[in-house]
């Protein structure tokens, strides 16, 4: 039977509960245990699919098409296990399920209430489908004390009594701030956070304390005394140079041993940390460095491109180089020539986005990469803009644009009005709902034999994750190919363009899907490995 670890956060948000959960899962895996990670988000949105990237950050898409929290990306990258739609739940989804059941009459006329109906639905989500796992780690979003998190805290409190003894523990992540005027770390915020948690009936078994400097033993003893946890269960979580340093750091602090001890488990074998030590060695001892420009729309918030940032780093690991990212707001190139900025970089990447803002600036960056033979990688929207740029500047198609931007006689990119979902043909219109209406999840693509991208993959049939509402218009394929743009990948039915490239360019590839979502530190995505390899070659020419 699975054992449950519930991870809560206190004092402030953005302490890194997702990284803490992923790191603990990696440590348990290194000891030979099977682990599942789940995220419970208290917001009322059904999913983050329609939320602004500036508010929520990246939307992480799973193989089965769920739009989920970006922490699931950390879970996948640290454990190598693919998440699915059942690994992330929101208050909105919980309430939607309950209302649907109430309308069907499933509650037999009962008054539907937060307790027991909402909490029962949360508990059902937490405990379903865990038979094959040794541990289930559940991260509770938000901060203790948030009113919207109360049903989740009540649900995990109840599970402590409903599951067998020693099958549930609580890890509380908190902050110990340093007050420079006093010259000391302060324990009081953590004490109050634990007090708030205890007020809802939850007593943490382990305190994971974030700090920017080592915590003195006297302060750890103080936390142990006032927060009612064992001295060894006060684990310091110091700031690390990279997130991939965290598992080793937590192991050295004894987090995994303390978790097993809390469950009454005393394994004889230490975890095998060899691959984590290899990764951190590569990160801190690169054999060179390159610089790439990411020309994007949401560059003001790096969390909007979290998986992309990590995938680029993985490409650097594969090539034993440090990759410096120069974040460029695409609107900059709508006001000025990109040459002075881009001539210094070794590669250009245009990531996914929605809407017309910054599109012209991105196309100027794409034109620069094409004409100057700089390695270029276009993802989703980046591929679509590469096709529009070719239509305008090579094929000389008048008013070439996207129907997402404006009405045009030559929509190189158009709205997907219908596609198969399972065996059902779904249709949507411009006035329909936006939530869950995109092409989402893993789909197959057929790559041309001997194309550059097929050589990179080492195969001609691939499965990649998609998240898009618009597609390159197949009606313009022949005209664009006559101008040298190769449609090197198509959907198996030959209807949807999936990849493009220029045969006479050192490295120019656009993909309709999101390869960054499947890249892992121990298994870098081949496209990112190849792209960074090309930038290394470019660095020798600049």
From Swiss-Prot:
| Record: residues binding L-glutamine | 54, 353, 381-384, 404, 469
GO CC term, one of those recorded: cytosol
Question: Per its UniProt entry, which superkingdom is the organism in?
Answer: Bacteria
Keywords attached to this Swiss-Prot or TrEMBL record, sorted alphabetically, are:
ATP-binding, Glutamine amidotransferase, Ligase, Magnesium, Metal-binding, Nucleotide-binding, Pyrimidine biosynthesis
Query: Recorded GO terms, molecular function?
Result: ATP binding; CTP synthase activity; glutaminase activity; identical protein binding; metal ion binding
Residues bound to CTP? 13, 146-148, 186-191, 222
Q: How is its activity regulated?
A: Allosterically activated by GTP, when glutamine is the substrate; GTP has no effect on the reaction when ammonia is the substrate. The allosteric effector GTP functions by stabilizing the protein conformation that binds the tetrahedral intermediate(s) formed during glutamine hydrolysis. Inhibited by the product CTP, via allosteric rather than competitive inhibition.
InterPro entries, per the entry: Class_I_gatase-like, CTP_synthase, CTP_synthase_N, GATASE, GATase1_CTP_Synthase, P-loop_NTPase
According to its UniProt entry, the protein's GO biological process terms are:
'de novo' CTP biosynthetic process; pyrimidine nucleobase biosynthetic process
Listed name of the protein: CTP synthase
Organism of provenance: Bartonella henselae (strain ATCC 49882 / DSM 28221 / CCUG 30454 / Houston 1)
